[in-house]
Regions:
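AAA+ P-loop ATPase catalytic core
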Residues: 2
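Alpha-helical transmembrane bundle of multi-pass membrane proteins
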Residues: 6-258
Length: 258
């Protein structure tokens, strides 16, 4: 099987120099559209907030009402375990069972619901994360626990949706002749946005008076980008599960709205 695949790749790329690959990537409309899809997937996924939640999980749990260093580390560890189990289950079972596009839409929906809830909670307690001396009222304790639970829900949604699809789409969409170049570009954009998001979020969480957009504004921003991503996926991403390379080429020969 490996030898057959290698032979097919060698045959597909035979006689294609660097300039030929670049021209085929950017001058063939169906290939350029695939580049657009993978680039948008990388941008929308990284700025949906899930990556920064993982990076800054202890601080964000404290922001939502977790008190104490040990408690913060514990809920962060549980979050990591949930994301690991969800990623394995989604990658090995759910994505192929329910289809790429449906999995992506369900995951984005879960993530959007989570972000909207967290943003709404932070809006109801605007001093959270802004005033260091602020104490969460007793009547907001239940809402705080709900926001913490929504972090876990967003982790599952991320594993089912963007986390799986941003890599699968990049690997599956392109013909063999241009796959190496296009995958390299997509992954470069992926890590550039991941780095940019990780650097931006601490500044976004700052109070408006010090140049940030507040915690509530940060999560409303994540919610908006996640919802925009869901709408974009609905109209732009085709179902690619079970398609051969030949049928993939025929799929992208159609107009985008089909």
């Amino acid at each position: 099987m490996i030898q057959t695949t290698h032979a097919a790749e060698m045959e597909a790329t035979m006689g294609s120099g660097a300039m030929g690959v670049i021209k085929e990537t950017f001058l063939v409309p169906s290939n350029l559209y695939r580049v657009y899809l993978t680039f948008m997937a990388q941008i929308l996924s990284q700025w949906s907030g899930a990556g920064s939640i993982t990076v800054y999980a202890p601080d964000l749990f404290k922001l939502l009402g977790v008190t104490g260093e040990n408690e913060s580390l514990l809920v962060t560890a549980v979050f990591g375990i949930i994301k690991l189990i969800a990623a394995i289950l989604c990658a090995l079972f759910l994505v192929d069972v329910i289809g790429r596009k449906r999995a992506l839409l369900i995951g984005i929906t879960l993530q959007a619901i989570s972000m909207v809830y967290i943003a709404g909670f932070l809006t109801s307690v605007p001093a959270m994360g802004v005033d260091e001396n602020y104490t969460l009222p007793a009547d907001k304790k239940g809402a705080s626990e709900g926001a913490i639970a929504m972090i876990y829900v967003s982790g599952f949604g991320w594993a089912l949706g963007w986390n799986s699809m941003q890599y699968l789409l990049t690997a599956e969409l392109f013909p063999l002749r241009i796959r190496a170049l296009c995958t390299s570009m997509a992954m470069t954009l992926h890590f550039a946005n991941q780095y940019g998001n990780a650097r931006a979020v601490p500044n976004m969480l700052l109070p408006v008076a010090t140049g940030g957009i507040d915690p509530k504004g940060t999560f409303w921003c994540f919610a908006a980008i996640t919802i925009i991503g869901g709408v974009w996926v609905w109209f732009s991403i085709p179902e690619t599960a079970g398609r051969s390379l030949e049928s993939m080429d025929r799929l992208f020969a159609l107009p985008w709205y089909k």
